[in-house]
Design a protein with these regions (language model features):
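Sec-dependent N-terminal signal peptides
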Residues: 4-13
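Solvent-exposed loop/turn segments at secondary-structure junctions
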Residues: 29-32, 58-59, 75-79, 103-108
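FMN-binding flavodoxin-like domain, especially the glycine-rich phosphate-binding loop
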Residues: 22, 71, 79-160
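A short, well-structured beta->alpha microelement
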Residues: 44-63
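Short, charged N-terminal beta->alpha structural module
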Residues: 19-49
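Short, well-ordered secondary-structure micro-motifs within conserved domains or adaptor modules
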Residues: 61-76
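A general structural motif
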Residues: 19, 65-66, 94-95
């Protein structure tokens, strides 16, 4: 019995050490970014994903060897934060990047994705609403939808 417990602990520690890390970059400590980061982490745990999430508040924190980088683009009604655009213009390997656009778009509950081939930046993109006037809409369902798409893209990128 003791050997089984030791072996189980060994496997759990090994799995934790070798779990793939996904870096989430947010440029501002806005309520939207903090909630989105928290939601990603919470949904990752509830879906029992084998990834560890690390969070960075600036691009300079990236080492360059990340397998997957998620960039949160928020605080806008449309378009991309100029700091994100500038960073994406300099990145060599865009295959590792997922851009998550969290827009304030009024009444619409939007959740959609764009493949890298169709993206202006050459990266996979997900767009979702952060707030809307129609409070009758199911907020949790919308957030679950964009995080499910995010996790699907992470799985694909981890396999590359």
């Amino acid at each position: 019995m003791k050997r089984v417990v030791v072996l189980l602990v060994f496997f759990l520690v090994s799995f934790a050490l070798y779990a793939a890390t996904v870096t989430v970059v947010y440029l501002d400590r806005s309520e939207t970014n903090l909630e989105a980061s928290s939601y990603i982490k919470k949904q990752g745990k509830s879906n029992k994903l084998p990834h560890k999430f690390s969070f960075a508040s600036k691009f300079s924190a990236l080492k360059g060897d990340e397998k997957v980088v998620v960039i949160l683009n928020s605080g806008r009604s449309s378009g991309t934060d100029p700091r994100i655009s500038a960073y994406l213009d300099t990145v060599g390997n865009k295959q590792t990047i997922i851009l998550v656009n969290l827009y304030s778009i009024g009444k619409n509950i939007l959740s959609g994705s764009v493949k890298s081939a169709n993206s202006d930046f050459g990266v996979d993109e997900i767009s979702a609403a952060t707030q809307w006037e129609d409070r009758a809409g199911d907020v949790q369902a919308m957030h679950k939808q964009w995080t499910a798409e995010l996790f699907r893209l992470i799985e694909i990128k981890q396999a590359l």
